[in-house]
């Protein structure tokens, strides 16, 4: 997959960005370089290779030190929603921003 200058212009427009011609060309080169790298990675045969969770795990035995998941603060929903202009079913009600 590779993008064209038209694709970059369209994406910039959707993101409300104004890109100069040089910036657009630089973005095109960088993004197409990224896609080329992804295609190279996809081409590698990884059959029989165990997924890697952490790169250090390849050279030493590590165990992820995760804390116990426990409540540390009380539920303050009502206090936080006290000044909300609109609520519905216990949730903040906001205007629709995406059509």
Curated annotation (Swiss-Prot):
EC class: ligase
GO biological process: glutaminyl-tRNAGln biosynthesis via transamidation; regulation of translational fidelity; translation
Keywords: ATP-binding, Ligase, Nucleotide-binding, Protein biosynthesis
Superkingdom, taxonomy of origin: Bacteria
EC number(s) stated in the UniProt entry for this protein: 6.3.5.-
Nucleotide-binding recorded as keyword: yes
Gene Ontology molecular function, alphabetical: asparaginyl-tRNA synthase (glutamine-hydrolyzing) activity; ATP binding; glutaminyl-tRNA synthase (glutamine-hydrolyzing) activity
Catalysed reactions, as listed in the record: L-glutamyl-tRNA(Gln) + L-glutamine + ATP + H2O = L-glutaminyl-tRNA(Gln) + L-glutamate + ADP + phosphate + H(+); L-aspartyl-tRNA(Asn) + L-glutamine + ATP + H2O = L-asparaginyl-tRNA(Asn) + L-glutamate + ADP + phosphate + 2 H(+)
Protein purpose: Allows the formation of correctly charged Asn-tRNA(Asn) or Gln-tRNA(Gln) through the transamidation of misacylated Asp-tRNA(Asn) or Glu-tRNA(Gln) in organisms which lack either or both of asparaginyl-tRNA or glutaminyl-tRNA synthetases. The reaction takes place in the presence of glutamine and ATP through an activated phospho-Asp-tRNA(Asn) or phospho-Glu-tRNA(Gln).
HAMAP family: GatC
Assembly description: Heterotrimer of A, B and C subunits.
Family membership noted in the UniProt record: Belongs to the GatC family.
Name of this protein: Aspartyl/glutamyl-tRNA(Asn/Gln) amidotransferase subunit C
Organism: Albidiferax ferrireducens (strain ATCC BAA-621 / DSM 15236 / T118) (Rhodoferax ferrireducens)
């Amino acid at each position: 997959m590779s993008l064209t200058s038209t694709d970059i212009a369209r994406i910039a427009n959707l993101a409300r960005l104004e890109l100069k011609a040089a910036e657009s060309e630089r973005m095109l080169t960088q993004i197409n370089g990224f896609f080329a790298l992804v295609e190279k990675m996809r081409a590698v045969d990884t059959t029989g290779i165990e997924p890697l969770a952490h790169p250090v795990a390849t050279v030493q035995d590590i165990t992820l030190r995760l804390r116990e998941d426990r409540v540390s603060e009380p539920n303050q929903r009502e206090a936080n929603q006290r000044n909300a202009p609109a609520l519905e079913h216990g949730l903040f009600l906001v205007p629709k921003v995406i059509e």
